[in-house]
């Protein structure tokens, strides 16, 4: 544990059963709750066994019976779907700043975290640690620099300080581009370069991506950033850069993603779908090869 962390166990708590309509998402929490196969399983589990692990919550500021969820957003959503009217919870006396840190720390252990979730989680924690550093009643004795906090976050998540900063840069992307990063259509490094484009430039880029069915390589992203910083980037230049054939670009077949997505589990990412398709093609190729050899041996 680092000097920046606030262990949940160190806080006095009380248990309670809280009506679901009195529970609210923590303001700005970065973790997405989606209805997929895993969520369906959680709903069925709650219907059969109830909630095994209580939610962790804090009382909302200036209220007496309203609460913010620190840990358990998925359980809360599943409970609503399961028809529950109240859930077990542990109420901790967190300040807003402590709560922000706890929200991030309690969710970063998940098996799969999207780049957008990491981006806003790291940003939330960095801002909270910065605020915490200004308080003498919390764990930091002096204001921490961005470098200090990024290093601390990196140690907790097994990432370098620079990688933490890269993820935080993604929060400057428009939602449409950030979605492409989550879908693994744009890699992290090119996405960081694109984050330096203005909002309008990003929307112009998105228009070209949609019309030309292409995404920028690192080289293209770097050129777009350079043109933007020079103040000369416009829709025409974006189109010109994106229309250039990439060095390793080869002829390809494309089709709407939605046409095949329905054949795979909801929990599959785009990469999972891609790998499954390759396996199916590979299995079919091996089957045809075996059939050919059998014919040749006759």
Regions found by a protein language model. Give the residues of each.
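Amphipathic, charge-rich alpha-helical segments that serve as recognition/docking helices
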Residues: 77-172, 196
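Amphipathic alpha-helical extensions and coiled-coil-like segments
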Residues: 161-276
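Glutamine-centric residue-chemistry signal
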Residues: 49-53, 132, 142, 202, ...
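Short, charged/polar connector segments at secondary-structure boundaries
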Residues: 1-92, 98-112, 288
């Amino acid at each position: 544990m680092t000097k920046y962390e606030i262990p949940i166990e160190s806080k006095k708590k009380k248990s309670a059963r809280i009506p679901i309509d009195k529970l609210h998402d923590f303001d700005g929490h970065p973790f997405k709750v989606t209805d997929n196969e895993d969520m369906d399983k959680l709903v069925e589990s709650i219907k059969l066994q109830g909630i095994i692990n209580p939610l962790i919550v804090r009382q909302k500021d200036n209220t007496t019976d309203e609460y913010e969820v620190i840990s358990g957003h998925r359980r809360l959503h599943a409970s609503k779907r399961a028809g529950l009217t109240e859930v077990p919870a542990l109420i901790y006396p967190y300040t807003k700043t402590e709560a922000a840190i706890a929200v991030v720390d309690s969710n970063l252990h998940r098996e799969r975290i999207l780049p957008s979730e990491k981006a806003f989680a790291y940003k939330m924690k960095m801002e909270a640690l910065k605020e915490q550093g200004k308080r003498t009643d919390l764990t930091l004795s002096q204001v921490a620099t961005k470098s200090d906090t990024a290093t601390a976050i990196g140690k907790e998540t097994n990432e370098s300080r620079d990688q933490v900063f890269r993820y935080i840069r993604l929060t400057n992307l428009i939602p449409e581009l950030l979605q492409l990063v989550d879908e693994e259509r744009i890699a992290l490094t090119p996405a960081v370069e694109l984050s330096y484009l203005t909002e309008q430039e990003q929307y112009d880029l998105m228009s070209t991506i949609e019309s030309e069915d292409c995404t920028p390589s690192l080289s293209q992203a770097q050129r777009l950033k350079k043109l933007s910083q020079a103040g000369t980037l416009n829709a025409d230049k974006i189109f010109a850069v994106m229309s250039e054939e990439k060095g390793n670009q080869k002829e390809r077949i494309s089709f709407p993603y939605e046409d095949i997505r329905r054949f795979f589990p909801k929990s599959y990412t785009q990469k999972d779908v891609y790998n499954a398709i390759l396996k199916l093609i590979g299995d079919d190729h091996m089957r045809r090869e075996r059939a050919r050899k059998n014919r040749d041996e006759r």
